[in-house]
Amino acid sequence: MPPLCILAVVKRRAALIVVGILSVGCKTDAQIIPKSQVASVGQNVGPAHIEIIYHRPVARGRDLFGALVPYDRVWSPSADTAAIFSTTRPLDIEKSQLPAGKYSVWAIPGKDTWTLIFSSAVPVFHLRYRDASDVLRVKITPQSGDHMETLGFYFPMVDADSAVLALHWGKTVVPLKIRAR
C-alpha cells in the first residue's frame, strides 16, 4: 500500500475513534420527557409548613369527571405516583384533625360531593389505593371555575392561621379548608 493510502486509513480510523469517545459521554436529545410533569406547591399556614408534590395530568380535550374519571370511584389526583401532602404541624382539614406527617392524597369524585382521602401509604403508585391506610376522609362540595388544562393544586386564600388549598382540573375546583393547630 502506498504511504499516502496508509496515512488516509490511519486518519480515518483516528477520526472514528475520537467521534466514538466523544459520543459516549454525550447526552441524547431523544430522552423521554413525561407528559405529566412533576409540580409542587408549598405554603406556610401559621406555624405549619404545607407542601404537596404531584404529577400534572393534562385534559387534552377529554371529558374529565364522570367520563375519564368515573364518579364514585377512588381516583388519584396525580399521574404516575400518588400526590404527596406533607405538613410539619397538625392541621384541621374541613374541621377534622390531621396529624403532622406525610400522606398520599386520593379522591372520590361525585357529581355533588367529593371525598378527599389522606392515606399513610407513602410513596405509592397512583393506582394502588388501600383503604386500610386511610388517616382522614373529608367531604367537600366542588365548585365550577375557569377551564384549567393541566391539573393543579394551589392556595387561592391564605390568612394568618388558615388557608384554602384548591384542586383544579378542567372546570372543577375542589376547595379544601385548612386551619393550623
Q: Model features per residue range: what roles?
A:
Residues 2-15:
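Bacterial N-terminal signal peptides that target proteins for export
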Residues 28-73, 123-181:
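Primarily secretory-pathway and cell-envelope proteins
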Residues 24, 45-46, 94, 100:
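Short glycine-rich loop/turn motifs that provide flexible caps or phosphate-binding loops at active sites
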Residues 15-25:
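Bacterial N-terminal signal peptides
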Residues 76-124:
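Mid-length scaffold segments of soluble, non-membrane domains
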Residues 8, 79, 173:
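Extended interaction regions within the primary functional domain
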